[in-house]
């Protein structure tokens, strides 16, 4: 057995299918029977039931309004993390969800975790919950857990108590070893207890949610029986409805069958006018979004999920994808995604999981065209939109503000990237390292540096080199130390001693510079001229045999006040090597000149090899 095989249950071997073809398989279909153990698995109609709904109506429905959203990142998402969120990360996530516009947020499982209990108490006691936001807490149908849950929520204005028990055939038989009546009694006993305990907390606006967990593995007739019994106990009204959540706890079948089961419940459950029908799709088969959309068309009112699809196993349904799918159809999602990079960075920081490059709407590559024909079509599409605003114009002649009210019609781009805070990216060379968003977020929020997008790839590779060599995680301080060492503190082969710039802002007259430097250990003074300070400095460095070509330049204020600092970023090709340089100084001019020196030293310092921009 090879070393690689030691980590799997059998030797790694792919067997090319050579078995018989299916009966009636067309001659043009050359697929052959495989050795996969298909006999071990049952179709859904055998394992659970065959749901028959020949008069289904959902295929003719359209999504025209957004559902009631409920974000479960802080509970379902958090419990699935290798490293569950710290209190600080939970606060960041909660604040993000509120800022985006979520009005129902599941904040934890306070009876199961002291950390969750403490977080619920914190956001209540610190008055962090807006009046129009309802927190949701999960609890199993057990008395001591229910009482603990109410203790956690004391003092909150609006709370949904979400109680559940599993009703599926498999869990009834294997996990609980209970019959149908016993499982139903678990649910109704919990409902009665919750209703009784709530009377001890009259200052809170209590709402109720019940989930027959593993609904997709439950016979719909029995699911209705349990739901009806719980609803009868809770006695909701049209003015004060309760939530019945029908989770695809494990996605077991195609989205159309899930939609049939939702429409069946929508039609048949008792007291439908007093029920908010909710969906909670998972993504085990990779069709969570489709299941949610079809289930919503089938009669649901509400959808639970996580940002970017975090959650157990393959995750919960992605609320970002769902909401922005609606936006592409002209439906207001009633959530804000105008800065999806910030949303992504915050979620990556909180979850310590990166959002994949191909994730809809938010991945690094989703608005990128690598194919030449795709690039051409995108460019022509943008030009055509510009011509609608100004006949004869192309995309470079019209600002985004002028295009913003124009209907979006660009090939290969289902949404205007700028509507979610992205750019019109033609080709981006993306480093394979993960964590660009997280690195950029920490550098921005903790250190005031808005690293240019293309530089983020380079710096994330620098950070990864350190973690590969030293192991462990890189915290905020360590990240700053890495950044300073890589970009700010190099003094070889060029160290700036003094710079004098003249005519930096004068029109029609070249800028000039006198630079006192230490070059390869020797004091030197060089002069230069150019159409700006950077060009003048490049001209001066040329006299030392250093060829500098500035290819990209970015700058911003890092701090404000009397001791304000500016940060500048320069992408330069230095003696044929393309690198980024960074400068921080009290003025933007001197920060920019420092950035050039930084790039020079990163390109030429033989003792400290730099990561090259673009990996070249």
Swiss-Prot record:
Location (main, coarse): cytoplasm
Keywords attached to this entry: Amino-acid biosynthesis, Branched-chain amino acid biosynthesis, Cytoplasm, Leucine biosynthesis, Magnesium, Metal-binding, Transferase
Subcellular location: Cytoplasm
The keyword Magnesium appears for this protein: yes
Gene Ontology CC, one term: cytoplasm
Gene3D superfamilies: 3.30.160.270, Aldolase class I (3.20.20.70)
Reactions the enzyme catalyzes: 3-methyl-2-oxobutanoate + acetyl-CoA + H2O = (2S)-2-isopropylmalate + CoA + H(+)
GO MF annotation list: 2-isopropylmalate synthase activity; acetyl-CoA C-acetyltransferase activity; magnesium ion binding
Annotated EC: 2.3.3.13
Pyruvate carboxyltransferase domain residues: 67-341
Annotated stretches, region: Disordered: 1-34
Pathway it works in: Amino-acid biosynthesis; L-leucine biosynthesis; L-leucine from 3-methyl-2-oxobutanoate: step 1/4
Family assignment from sequence similarity: Belongs to the alpha-IPM synthase/homocitrate synthase family. LeuA type 2 subfamily.
Protein name (record): 2-isopropylmalate synthase
